[in-house]
């Protein structure tokens, strides 16, 4: 009989009480011989990306039981960043990542679970589950709830695709009528699923697919499509298979740390750069690498950004394509296929199918596969009806988008840009680096300089933008919004979208030690490290200072003399306990957020907790 981890609680005379409790959950004598597989669900009625996951949990549970496992489901919390954004609720979003990861560890280890299937979707939940899987290192399979269909509105001569960001942009435009804004509001988010652009949720689900912890198609197959149900069933069968393979055959290749190794992280980051994904993914990959003891740092991302082309353009970088269009073009596997044709990937990395990347692409890249089922899956398209029911439609595109010259996904030779969609900048203003999403920036803005307008909070900056205090050429500096200084590293979607609504998004820059929503576009530079609260130079910027940004040379520079900089450091340190803290900011910080801030490191470390501040156990 195999020695499952769960035997700790299901075998032996001294575990009679535990077995009695297990029986009260429905387990039988036969079940005590099988692996206990956790369904780590994140169903929530607060989040459209999670509203349908209760039904998903039931499908997975039934399939696990059918194939010889004992399914046990529990839920994590889930915060909707879009609803939490623009007010104090956003302070809680990033800290929830650590809370979710910890809660998974608690449940899994307390009950000696053998393996887990992670049912996630939105911004902080997928990263948290990824971190937990690497921390626990038990067989794990990921399956997301799937992307939302893009919204649609009819104009005079055509139908236009829209998404959540359009609703925010138009909501900040005083020239738009209430009726028009209502029309956008009613159309922007038409179905269940993660928001339809390549925002943080979809970016992370695509990266998990590239890493190899989910099945092909997971990142782009729509939540509403009937094929998504098949994916859930396949994922359930897969977790049973790899669980038994590990415990019965001692196959350690199926463990998360062996699948998600440095080469896999590099492949995932290459995908991210190639498709211009959310800058938040960098934060989460760095945090996950720490959990898995993977030597993957900001410098690795910087090196990749110098050689990976931008070959896939998706909203918010364009209004032509959404994630449903990426799927039609072949999804994650097609993007990886194009990179592989240019020898930009490590082909020997393995996944939960037990295949290396080379074999996986041969089967799942639409430009090379002969598998009819794979081709059929990538034909899955949007139903076009408002619904929160998953698997409720079976629409298929008439043909796939295989256009490597002018299509959604292009070849290296026909790339949107030879420079990738994400870049790392360094300089005296960001000694440890900062991140910019170059996918949405016109090349003529790659070199930009202007006078600083400094704000101690996002709210203060928003007020300045809406009251007309920002003019073309300004560099807006929002500081003390980092992991520690916020605390919680708020997303700056509202400042950037309000700039867009008044047509200043291409004429101004915005830099911050906070972060940006996956929906952000324009010359927006975030994750400045060290952050202001950790004695970063951004804390010393003054109104009118010249700030120079050079994306070509990957630099960001506060243009003052070394002497002046040293004088400012001395002046700041002289403030004592008030040094490196925001002036006159009124913000209610709860005990929970203060506890998070106490341990939080800057963004270049993934905003993880500082081990040096923990007790030495």
UniProtKB/Swiss-Prot annotation:
Pathway note: Amino-acid biosynthesis; L-isoleucine biosynthesis; L-isoleucine from 2-oxobutanoate: step 3/4; Amino-acid biosynthesis; L-valine biosynthesis; L-valine from pyruvate: step 3/4
TM region(s), chain numbering: none
E.C. numbers: 4.2.1.9
Residues binding Mg(2+), per UniProt: 81, 123-124, 491
Enzyme class at the top of the EC tree: lyase
Catalytic activity: (2R)-2,3-dihydroxy-3-methylbutanoate = 3-methyl-2-oxobutanoate + H2O; (2R,3R)-2,3-dihydroxy-3-methylpentanoate = (S)-3-methyl-2-oxopentanoate + H2O
Disulfide bond entries: none
UniProt keyword Iron present: yes
Cofactor(s) annotated in UniProt: [2Fe-2S] cluster; Mg(2+)
GO terms assigned for molecular function: 2 iron, 2 sulfur cluster binding; dihydroxy-acid dehydratase activity; magnesium ion binding
One GO term describing the cellular component: cytosol
Cofactor note: Binds 1 [2Fe-2S] cluster per subunit. This cluster acts as a Lewis acid cofactor.
Modification N6-carboxylysine occurs at: 124
NCBIfam families from the UniProt entry: ilvD, PRK12448.1
Entry similarity comment: Belongs to the IlvD/Edd family.
Alphabetical list of HAMAP family matching this protein: IlvD
Subunit structure: Homodimer.
Known role: Functions in the biosynthesis of branched-chain amino acids. Catalyzes the dehydration of (2R,3R)-2,3-dihydroxy-3-methylpentanoate (2,3-dihydroxy-3-methylvalerate) into 2-oxo-3-methylpentanoate (2-oxo-3-methylvalerate) and of (2R)-2,3-dihydroxy-3-methylbutanoate (2,3-dihydroxyisovalerate) into 2-oxo-3-methylbutanoate (2-oxoisovalerate), the penultimate precursor to L-isoleucine and L-valine, respectively.
Protein name in the entry: Dihydroxy-acid dehydratase
Species of the source: Buchnera aphidicola subsp. Schizaphis graminum (strain Sg)
